[in-house]
């Protein structure tokens, strides 16, 4: 088979090189984008008179026929096809004859592949953002059912202050909202047409890049031909955004793994999202949460692979850039799969409200409120903090909770304590008093859920 670039060479390529050089095993997923881009390019060539209108129609019909063959699974892949671009061109020429060789006029594989990857990534960004929206809806539905469900908030994995399960879930809604915003920003920078840049220096033909951009739905044109073919920032940006999505999923999964232990007992995974042990019959393992947590490392690796690949490249295109696709494709596939599994899983988790309630009431989570109570009675907060620390130590030594201490015991530490202290340190009061925007008070959480739902309507 003749090569797209074979005229310069006397010797055949070494078979080992052919295998090493080929990207068809992974870039074949771009076939629909490659064909769509070629159809738009053929139309443009005919529109401006670089080829005849009849030739343009022949190319377009041939390309649609090739697309049908791909969709129907009728394409036979050859080891001699270097990549999806050369395969599509070979199939087109076999179908329409010599006119097929005119398709590549005013185009290089350098701007062609940049186009394909951008088109692919725009669609995948939209798909990931939709999955993020579905996850946020699921979390909001869950939060709505748990506005009053007490949960200890933690710092350093030590019980800290009372919150609610709804408030905790809303923290992740905010993370996934930021993820969606990052992807929207990435999409804007991906939505730039590189076609027309040629190999690196544009073309002498009077092409109409604006027409091609409109045909393919691009918002802008690449402003510099060198940058157009060498830019993979958009792929790096996506992988960085995907890595953060995986960080957020991994953190949530870590909590689910912890909460599902007997030591915490806050949650139980549904049977459909857990597995057992081949040896220990009592086990119910949160394997899906652990797998998502583990797969985060893959996406971090994909990001690092892209950065390492790009860091030493001179302008413009270099063969190293063929390595962008496997990392990008893996990041896309992994984050989509993890989002789908996590959304299905989190909606089935059983939360143990009594265990959470006991943990809130048994860990001095209302100590800060006791300090605030003293500060409200004129005791300087730093002094109030010291006093409450001493009270907690005393309660630990006597085996009591703050609610179980007598007024006489309290007054050994501060005369500012009155009978109303017991109302002030009730966990329910501690929550209800935190009505600040973004706080865990039930009425504040209800408003936050409503705002988050409204925000999702605009996505």
UniProtKB/Swiss-Prot annotation:
GO MF entries: argininosuccinate lyase activity
Compartment(s): Cytoplasm
Enzyme class at the top of the EC tree: lyase
Catalyzed reactions: 2-(N(omega)-L-arginino)succinate = fumarate + L-arginine
Pfam families named among the record's database cross-references: ASL_C2, Lyase_1
Pathway note: Amino-acid biosynthesis; L-arginine biosynthesis; L-arginine from L-ornithine and carbamoyl phosphate: step 3/3
Organism superkingdom: Bacteria
Keywords tagged on the record: Amino-acid biosynthesis, Arginine biosynthesis, Cytoplasm, Lyase
Enzyme Commission number: 4.3.2.1
GO-annotated cellular components: cytosol
InterPro entries: Arg_succ_lyase_C (IPR029419), Argininosuccinate_lyase (IPR009049), Fumarase/histidase_N (IPR024083), Fumarate_lyase_CS (IPR020557), Fumarate_lyase_fam (IPR000362), Fumarate_lyase_N (IPR022761), L-Aspartase-like (IPR008948)
Main location: cytoplasm
Signal peptide (residue range): none
Single Gene Ontology BP annotation: arginine biosynthetic process via ornithine
Keyword Lyase on entry: yes
Assigned protein family: Belongs to the lyase 1 family. Argininosuccinate lyase subfamily.
Name this polypeptide is given: Argininosuccinate lyase
Source organism: Desulforudis audaxviator (strain MP104C)
Encoding gene, per UniProt annotation: argH
